[in-house]
Amino acid sequence: MRLSTPNLQLNEQGKLRHFLTIEGLKQHHLTEILDVAESFINPVTGDISKVPSLHGKTIMNLFFEPSTRTLTTFEIAEKRLSADVVNLNIETSSTKKGETLLDTLWNLEAMLADVFVVRHSESGAAHFIAKHVAPHVHVVNAGDGQHAHPTQAMLDMFTIRKHKGDIFDLKVAIIGDVQHSRVVRSQIQALSILEAREIRVIGPKTLMPSHPEALGVHVYDHIEEGLDGVDVIINVRLQNERMKSALLPSEKEFFNLYGLTKERLSYAKPDAIVMHPGPVNRGVEIDSEVADGHQSVILEQVTYGIAVRMAVMSIIIDNAKQLNADKQITKKVTEEARS
């Protein structure tokens, strides 16, 4: 699903007000997130700092889809920023009793929320919410349907940059269910904006986008050919819950043809890194020997997700403070000019 509304997530100064999608953002928006995330990590110990940036702010995590890593890392990030954190229990919420999403939203807004972190099964849900929140409220998309997962893409970019330096000139291969993955869509957009040299997608035709040329990617049917000489390998899981029909003979057959094994990894550069946004299905998209091997940075992705999500939330709050301060200065100058 294409939701080309980049201006919705920018304020009148062209800075992030919401973080809904990678699409439509400029390179400086992405590098700012990466740089701020870096500032939260101790360069000696690798520990992630606790800072008072969001002290007094209330963040509500509205997860209408199951999540372990994303919800937990968001909650840790929010607490590291010293925010007050509320997790909405969907199973006991009023949406289960017939209340509309908007009514739920407005009631939560009345409880003085500053940021909504939203995960929803419907593509466009985060955009819908962002269109209806009060001017002082911010929305961060934690994954909506098949559309986007921007914070996951940014933590992946951060992980790549930590290991490879500049993303420019890298060859990146993405293996798996490209057609149904919101993560892949956001990854491709981020890699394109950050000027990766080449983006390859590998998998069966039934799991490839119908118009890959529009995404600026190279499609490979054979994994060995697709992995030849790449710097970064990203595995993604099969999105069985989003497939409307059987697109594969079996998971075993998928692994036989596209599973990342030690032998297949040897086609990439010797220092290539192996990534996976999770959850990892061992023996389906990746072999345990590779997932646990020295080239795997899968667990680092989880850790870096805390710093990146801290960066996103601190940036949107800081941008709002700066905008309000500038408006006050403009108002004061205007009043003085009139007097």
UniProtKB/Swiss-Prot annotation:
GO terms of molecular function? amino acid binding; aspartate carbamoyltransferase activity
Q: Which GO terms describe its cellular component?
A: cytosol
Residues that hold L-aspartate according to the record: 97, 182, 237
What keywords tag this UniProt record?
Pyrimidine biosynthesis, Transferase
Q: Enumerate the catalysed reactions.
A: carbamoyl phosphate + L-aspartate = N-carbamoyl-L-aspartate + phosphate + H(+)
Q: Which domain of life is it from?
A: Bacteria
Q: Where does carbamoyl phosphate bind?
A: 69-70, 119, 149, 152, 278-279
Cite the PROSITE patterns for this sequence. CARBAMOYLTRANSFERASE
EC numbers on record: 2.1.3.2
Q: Name one GO biological process term.
A: amino acid metabolic process
UniProt cross-references to Gene3D superfamilies, sorted A to Z: Aspartate/ornithine carbamoyltransferase
Part of which pathway? Pyrimidine metabolism; UMP biosynthesis via de novo pathway; (S)-dihydroorotate from bicarbonate: step 2/3
Q: What is said about its interaction partners and assembly?
A: Heterododecamer (2C3:3R2) of six catalytic PyrB chains organized as two trimers (C3), and six regulatory PyrI chains organized as three dimers (R2).
As for what it does, the entry says:
Catalyzes the condensation of carbamoyl phosphate and aspartate to form carbamoyl aspartate and inorganic phosphate, the committed step in the de novo pyrimidine nucleotide biosynthesis pathway.
Q: Which family does it belong to?
A: Belongs to the aspartate/ornithine carbamoyltransferase superfamily. ATCase family.
* Protein name according to UniProt: Aspartate carbamoyltransferase catalytic subunit
Source organism = Hydrogenovibrio crunogenus (strain DSM 25203 / XCL-2)
- The gene name on file is pyrB
